């Protein structure tokens, strides 16, 4: 089974670059403080790296 990463949205997506908003949505994050556990895949890492300034990553 693949490793997982916990991702938390810590800043608002309001007024951000549209592609970065889509990355946050693609990770399954909906509101500030919302945490999800996603698989550690290159696709998810790419979305995390693109919107890193709005996220907290653990694991």
From Swiss-Prot:
It comes from the Bacteria. Gene3D superfamilies: Ribosomal protein L30, ferredoxin-like fold domain (3.30.1390.20). The keyword Transferase does not apply. The keyword Manganese does not apply. InterPro entries: Ribo_uL30_ferredoxin-like_sf, Ribosomal_uL30_bac-type, Ribosomal_uL30_ferredoxin-like. Keywords: Ribonucleoprotein, Ribosomal protein. One of its GO terms (biological process) is translation. Coiled coil: none annotated. GO terms for molecular function: structural constituent of ribosome. GO terms for cellular component: cytosolic large ribosomal subunit. Pfam families: Ribosomal_L30 (PF00327). Belongs to the universal ribosomal protein uL30 family. NCBIfam families: rpmD_bact. Part of the 50S ribosomal subunit. This is Large ribosomal subunit protein uL30.
